[in-house]
Amino acid sequence: MTENIPLRVQFKRMSADEWARSDVILLEGEIGFETDTGFAKFGDGQNTFSKLKYLTGPKGPKGDTGLQGKTGGTGPRGPAGKPGTTDYDQLQNKPDLGAFAQKEETNSKITKLESSKADKSAVYSKAESKIELDKKLSLTGGIVTGQLQFKPNKSGIKPSSSVGGAINIDMSKSEGAAMVMYTNKDTTDGPLMILRSDKDTFDQSAQFVDYSGKTNAVNIVMRQPSAPNFSSALNITSANEGGSAMQIRGVEKALGTLKITHENPNVEAKYDENAAALSIDIVKKQKGGKGTAAQGIYINSTSGTAGKMLRIRNKNEDKFYVGPDGGFHSGANSTVAGNLTVKDPTSGKHAATKDYVDEKIAELKKLILKK
C-alpha cells in the first residue's frame, strides 16, 4: 500500500565557493545546493557545509572487479560548458527528493514540522536561536535597512537600570552617544521616538532617567527656525484629572525649585513688551463647557514657612511682597479702583478710613451743639 506523506523541504542555495567560505550550519534534514555545480548536501544540525558529504542516488549492486587498464594520455581541452543556472529544475545531478521523503528519520522531521505549522522563517529562527544566538555576538558595525523587532520572553531580562533591558548598551569603554536618532527629511509620518503604554494598570514610567553627573539630567534645545512659529521646546498635556500635569520637587539652598528666565530675542528694549516670563490661562471645557472656577495662582506651605509667601523685585529691589502672616508691602504709591476695607482702623500702622473719620466728626458735632 502506498502512503502519501505531506512534504515540506527546507533548503538554501549558494555557489560552491560561497559554501566553502560560509559558516552556516544547515538544520538536520535541510538541503544545501551548490548552484554552479548542481550538487547538494544534507544538513546534520552540527557541521558546516564543507564538512558534509555530497548526496548521491541509491547504491546499486557491486559489480565484478575488472582488469585495470593502462593510463591514457591527457587529451585535448574540451570546449567551454554552458553557463550554470540557479533554477532547481534545470540542475544536473539533482537528488531524489522522493527518496529522501521515504527515509524514516526524514518522515519524522517532516511530520514534526507539519504538526507545528513550521515555515521557512520559523525554521531559520529556531536554528539561529539554538546554534548562533547562544554564542556571544561580536558586531563591528553594519547597516540594517529594514525593521528590527525584539519580543523577548519574561525570563532572562533583568529589571536593572545598568544591566537590564531587552536592549542594553554599555558605553563604559566608548565615546560619543549611546544612541542617535537623526533625520534630514522635511516631513514624516511619525516622531523620531515613541513611548507608549495601552494599559491603565501599567505601573511603571514610560521613561526613567537616573543621573548624578555635572550637567543637566535632561537637555532640550530648540533652535530658532527660519520662520518663527507657535511650536514649543516642551509640550506637556495631561487628561488625568486626578493628578497634576507636571510635578516638580527640589532641595535647593539658595535657588528656585523652578527657574524661569525670559530673554528678549531682539536688541530693541520694547520688542518683547507683550511677552511674559510666566503666562497662565484658565479656560472652560472645550466641548460644552459652561465656565470654570479654578484659581489662577495657589500658594501654600503645609508645614509653615517664615519666609515671604510672595516677593516681587525689579532691579534687585523689593517692590511688593506678602509676608508669612499675610501682611503685604508695596514699594510705591498704589491705586485701588474699588473699596479698601481696613478691619482695624485704629491701628497705629494703618491710616484712618473715611467711615471712621465721618463717625468721629459726627460725634464731635454733637458735643459742640450741647455746649
Curated annotation (Swiss-Prot):
Positions of the UniProt region annotated as Disordered: 54-88
Enzyme class label: hydrolase
Keywords: Degradation of host capsule during virus entry, Degradation of host cell envelope components during virus entry, Glycosidase, Hydrolase, Virion, Virus entry into host cell
Pfam families in alphabetical order: Hyaluronidase_1, Mtd_N
Alphabetical list of InterPro entries matching this protein: Hyaluronidase_bac, Mtd_N
Top-level taxonomic group: Viruses
UniProt similarity note: Belongs to the glycosyl hydrolase 69 family.
Its job: The hyaluronidase of this bacteriophage mediates the penetration of the hyaluronic capsule of Streptococcus pyogenes.
Protein name in UniProt: Hyaluronoglucosaminidase
